[in-house]
Amino acid sequence: MHSTFDFVIVGAGSAGCVLANRLSADGRFSVLLLEAAPQAWRGGNSMHVRNLRCMHDAPQDVLVDAYPEEEFWQDLLKVTGGRTNEALARRVIRDSATCRPWMRRHGVRFQPSLSGALHTARTNAFFMGGGKALVNAYYRSARQLGVQVRYESPVQRIELDDGRFVAAWVGNERIAARSCVLAAGGFESNRDWLRRAWGQNALGEWPADNFLIRGTRFNTGVLLKHLLDDHAADAIGDATQAHMVAIDARAPSYDGGICTRIDCVSLGVVVNREARRFYDEGEDFWPKRYAIWGRLVAQQPGQIGYSIIDAKAVGRFMPPVFDGVQADTLGDLARQLGLDAPTFEATVAAYNAACRPGNFDHTALDDCRTEGLAPAKTHWALPLDTPPYFGYAVRPGITFTYLGLQTDETAAVRFGGQPSPNLFVAGEMMAGNVLGQGYTAGVGMSIGTAFGRIAGTSAAAACGHQHAPQEATDAAA
């Protein structure tokens, strides 16, 4: 079977939907959107998102104060430890300042920062109805614009001619197109690939066996592997780096989403299964540090940790879906969590003794810290001395992986350092160009939205259409 389109988009998450809506805007071209998932699970990881990090030089509707380019860049530089392409990162940052009017035109609605979502009212615009509403809005718009969508249509391979896209294969169907954009996500739901990437630790464990997949089960990386292995596409990123969060250990194996997060880490202590602390819980604001905790827990014995708080923390963070273990004494809490009670009590006693008096303020980098304790807790260090006590078992939860396709400011896939003339990439498949490590809340949506629009413009240009009117509208918005 054979079919031909002007544009084929592989992957129908947020980035793919942005592409589809952009390329179909004037009705001149045929656009096919291929989604691996069934309709009920469409949207990739985008159905689990809740906000977009965006630059703005002055207050805007749901955003307070200002969040200028340089501050956004410094935040990104800090969380990535410098492992980022500055030119591409700044392109994302600048595009984030103009994308919301475009999103609104396609039915996306915004609301102010949620109560309990600390430190994001200035930096992040929240989606009204969450990621599911975002995805549904994009699909409604795509349908109205005449985009063809095929569900349960994973692309296993593509045909190339000297770096030029020719066709994509879905089963036995060959789909030719003048231009193609890849937006098929990472490989986080490919258990075998994760296992190979992470290998064994010093204890003989296979850490990836204990990972939970916070996002979609359909991002298996088949097409990414095909591009890297069979077509020698230029790669970017480390296969062990990912947006990895410490999530409720009771979460499902796949698709737990945002509701599995445990957001009280900075308000207490975190111990491993040996009942010992292993990292500074108060290093920085939670939106800039929540995504390092999955990796930290992955490096602990058994890939499990325990977030511990007392009654003083209740009401200061977004409560998890399921109640934690509760006890009136630390010893009883340890026993319920399966921890050695004397060791746990000694760990908490040492922490309590090291807490220095200060002015507690969870909205600022306060002066409540420990002294003479390793690892230190540098902010929000209050003694755990007010029952009841609460404990939450956490495991590594992967949202998306950072190994992907190297690209440039045109979003072109590159082969041997040369850009393809008609094959482009967007979303998580290229996020490693901006995120070499670490994460900050909402930046994945910034990357997907920005490069969805960039790839759409480049794909149109590859077919001789410059999208000038649309670009002018976006720039003025």
Model regions: which residues?
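Beta1/beta-strand and adjacent pyrophosphate-binding region of the FAD-binding site
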Residues: 2-15, 32
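Glycine-rich FAD pyrophosphate-binding loop
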Residues: 24-46
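Conserved N-terminal/central alpha/beta ligand/cofactor-binding core
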Residues: 39-148, 193-196, 270-277, 283, ...
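Glycine-rich loop(s) and the adjacent beta-strand/alpha-helix scaffold that form part
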Residues: 174-247, 454, 458
